[in-house]
Curated annotation (Swiss-Prot):
Presence of the UniProt keyword Transmembrane helix in the record: no
InterPro entries: Defensin_invertebrate/fungal, Scorpion_toxin-like_sf
Name the UniProt record assigns to this protein: Defensin
Classification lineage: Eukaryota, Metazoa, Ecdysozoa, Arthropoda, Hexapoda
Location(s), subcellular: Secreted
Chain's role: Mediates the inducible antibacterial activity in larvae of A.cyanea.
Organism from which the protein derives: Aeshna cyanea
Keywords: Antibiotic, Antimicrobial, Defensin, Disulfide bond, Immunity, Innate immunity, Secreted
Length: 38
């Protein structure tokens, strides 16, 4: 979701809109999941 697996920057920008999150990346077996980090 949120751009994954093809557009990791979309995932990153999505996570930046979440309070307390500094970014995100695609994770999981096929990079299908957008994972946010602090």
């Amino acid at each position: 979701g949120f751009g994954c697996p093809l557009d990791q920057m979309q995932c990153h920008r999505h996570c930046q809109t979440i309070t307390g999150r500094s970014g995100g990346y695609c994770s999981g077996p096929l990079k299908l999941t957008c994972t946010c980090y602090r």
